[in-house]
């Protein structure tokens, strides 16, 4: 009986051993909970690795199955449509093939398109084009030996604009207006920002159809589609996109110059892709500050250089090992406004329509007031600002060949000369030239040394070959000969005396091989003592300094 008596004093809470347990048991449960939690946390990355391993195995199996079913070329074409690289084609990815087979294309679905007033002003643009001169291509010299006819099929058949005339709403050109905080003459901004740099690399070549344009890309895509149905608003190589600069301003209008880097893919399946990359699209627009009226619009590919288009095409299923490259001359590619934008209807003070442009009728006649600019820049200066925005290496002036030597002689400086196939300051530039301008040539230490001790210049090989044969200008002809004597493909950097003597030179490929970082290289990748310089920057500075040293005996004599 005594065992059944509860001897707990009155007012005290009774311990429930079954529910609460001893302190040691509570500690045991706590340890178990902690260990379980740690185990779960540790297991998560293991599970993730296992899942990734499983997915990778499945992807490899699908790739092998695709290769077995389609062959290398077939899988290449499949991959060009498979934009998310999952080895499955969604209806959206299959759409280009459906359009090709049926001949029917659904209306384009552009994202983020700005709504337009159906009664607003409209602008009519006309496209003009002269096809690329095939004889200007390097491979034409041997009759395109080794180049299959199918590779150039898209280029040979492209003789005229895809759309000769098209009408746009004036409000669509709102994309060219400056953003907030950019309203002063000389201000520059990105209309379409570049998403590539030396670290991101470039976009793939094995694509046939451009992605759906978004936002401000929509108008640019529509404009370029007047030339060819497959424009890529974002080019494969940096700098991509479009930049703009306010050239002039008045109370109600802006005059804006702009520069666009875009390209076209010319071939259809079953031929492999052919990329046609103009050096740039330059242009200007005069529009009201509310984008309700466009006074003038013009966009064109500059044709003032002997070569202005880069071309690259695949002739096999491997993206890198089966690539051909050439450069050529495009005489004309431009869009121009028929006249200022005009309203399709006019209303009197009572809101009654008093005149209308009927279908097939004569256009309404308007008289436009003269625009008086309150502030403006020379067009050349505005274009230079665009150039520096896209290419920081142009913070140093690069003068034409003849002008560079005249300036060097007057200032008693050396000429820092770069000789290459494509223009250094546009998209017709070759691969090693692109690497140079995106790395060493834009680095602050190199810019400072070039500004202090050199006159800089770049030249096309073709231009110096022509200059070498100019019997009317013996002095410049000799300078061109001395340059070409030291030139090796594709890019040669030189330190040259004002009289044309080359005192130091290096090939771009050799330079890049010397400065590329390899896993087996010893030592730090950056020189902290030199202000965080990378190896290529310090090597280029050493190249320039060696040139200065070698030139001393000539300059002091």
UniProtKB/Swiss-Prot annotation:
Q: Which domain of life is it from?
A: Eukaryota
One Gene Ontology cellular component annotation held by this UniProt entry: endoplasmic reticulum membrane
Keywords from UniProt, A to Z, are:
Endoplasmic reticulum, Glycoprotein, Membrane, Oxidoreductase, Selenocysteine, Transmembrane, Transmembrane helix
Q: Where in the cell is it found?
A: Endoplasmic reticulum membrane
Query: Would I find Secreted among this entry's keywords?
Result: no
Q: Name one GO molecular function term.
A: oxidoreductase activity
Q: Which residues are glycosylated?
A: 451, 499
Q: Which residues cross the membrane?
A: 35-55
Q: Which GO terms describe its biological process?
A: calcium ion homeostasis; calcium-mediated signaling; muscle cell development; muscle tissue development; regulation of ryanodine-sensitive calcium-release channel activity; skeletal muscle fiber development
Q: What is its main location?
A: endoplasmic reticulum
Q: Segment Disordered: which positions? A: 1-28
Locations of Basic and acidic residues compositional bias?
Answer: 1-21
Q: Phenotype when inactivated?
A: Emrbyos show disruption of muscle architecture and greatly reduced motility. Embryonic muscle tissue display disorganization of the sarcomere and myofiber attachment defects. Embryos show a defect in the generation and development of slow muscle fibers and a decrease in the expression of myogenic lineage genes in slow muscle cell precursors.
Its function? Plays an important role in cell protection against oxidative stress and in the regulation of redox-related calcium homeostasis. Regulates the calcium level of the ER by protecting the calcium pump ATP2A2 against the oxidoreductase ERO1A-mediated oxidative damage. Acts as a modulator of ryanodine receptor (RyR) activity: protects RyR from oxidation due to increased oxidative stress, or directly controls the RyR redox state, regulating the RyR-mediated calcium mobilization required for normal muscle development and differentiation.
Q: How does it assemble?
A: Interacts with ryr3.
The protein here is known as Selenoprotein N
Origin species = Danio rerio (Zebrafish)
């Amino acid at each position: 009986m005594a065992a059944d008596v509860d001897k707990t004093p009155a007012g005290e809470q009774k311990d429930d051993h079954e529910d609460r347990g001893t302190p040691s048991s509570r500690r045991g449960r706590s340890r178990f909970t902690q260990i379980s939690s740690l185990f779960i946390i540790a297991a998560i990355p293991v599970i993730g690795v296992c899942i990734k391993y499983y997915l990778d195995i499945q992807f490899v199996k699908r790739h092998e199955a695709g290769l077995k079913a389609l062959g290398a070329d077939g899988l290449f074409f499949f991959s060009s449509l498979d934009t998310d690289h999952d080895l499955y084609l969604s209806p959206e990815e299959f759409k280009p093939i459906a359009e090709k087979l049926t001949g029917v294309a659904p209306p384009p679905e552009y994202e983020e398109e700005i709504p337009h007033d159906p009664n607003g002003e409209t602008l009519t643009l006309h496209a003009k084009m002269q096809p690329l001169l095939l004889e200007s291509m390097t491979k034409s010299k041997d009759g395109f030996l080794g180049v299959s006819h199918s590779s150039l099929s898209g280029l040979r058949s492209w003789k005229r604009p895809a759309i000769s005339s098209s009408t746009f709403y004036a409000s669509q050109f709102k994309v060219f207006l400056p953003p907030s905080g950019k309203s002063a003459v000389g201000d520059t901004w990105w209309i379409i920002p570049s998403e590539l740099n030396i670290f991101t690399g470039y976009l793939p070549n094995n694509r046939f159809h451009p992605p759906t344009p978004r936002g401000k890309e929509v108008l640019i895509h529509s404009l370029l589609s007047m030339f060819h149905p497959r424009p890529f608003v974002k080019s494969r190589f940096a700098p991509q996109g479009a930049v703009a600069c306010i050239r002039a301003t008045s109370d109600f209008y802006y005059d804006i110059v702009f520069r666009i880097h875009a390209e076209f893919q010319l071939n259809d399946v079953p031929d492999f892709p052919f990329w046609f990359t103009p050096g740039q699209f330059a242009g200007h627009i005069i529009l009201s500050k509310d984008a309700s009226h466009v006074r003038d619009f013009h966009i064109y590919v500059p044709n003032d250089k002997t070569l202005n288009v880069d071309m690259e095409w695949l002739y096999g299923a491997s993206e890198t090992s089966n690539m051909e490259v050439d450069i050529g001359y495009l005489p004309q590619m431009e869009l121009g406004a028929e006249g200022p934008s005009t309203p399709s209807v006019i209303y009197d003070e009572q809101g009654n329509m008093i005149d209308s442009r009927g279908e097939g009728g004569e256009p309404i006649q308007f008289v436009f007031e003269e625009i008086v600019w309150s502030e403006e820049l020379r067009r050349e200066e505005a274009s230079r600002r665009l150039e520096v925005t896209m290419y920081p290496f142009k913070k140093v002036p690069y003068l034409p060949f003849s002008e560079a030597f005249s300036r060097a002689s007057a200032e008693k400086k050396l000429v820092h000369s770069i000789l290459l196939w494509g223009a250094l300051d546009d998209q017709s530039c070759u691969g090693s030239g692109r690497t140079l301008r995106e790395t060493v040539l834009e680095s602050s230490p190199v810019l400072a040394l070039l500004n202090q001790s050199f006159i800089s210049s770049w030249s096309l090989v073709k231009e110096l070959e022509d200059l070498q044969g100019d019997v009317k200008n013996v002095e410049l002809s000799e300078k061109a000969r001395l340059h070409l004597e030291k030139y090796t493909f594709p890019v040669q950097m030189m330190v040259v005396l004002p009289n044309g003597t080359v005192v130091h030179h290096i090939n771009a490929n050799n330079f890049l091989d010397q400065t590329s970082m390899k896993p087996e290289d010893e030592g730090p990748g950056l020189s902290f003592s030199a202000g965080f310089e990378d190896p290529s920057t310090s090597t280029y500075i050493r190249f320039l300094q060696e040139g200065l040293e070698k030139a001393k005996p000539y300059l002091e004599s």
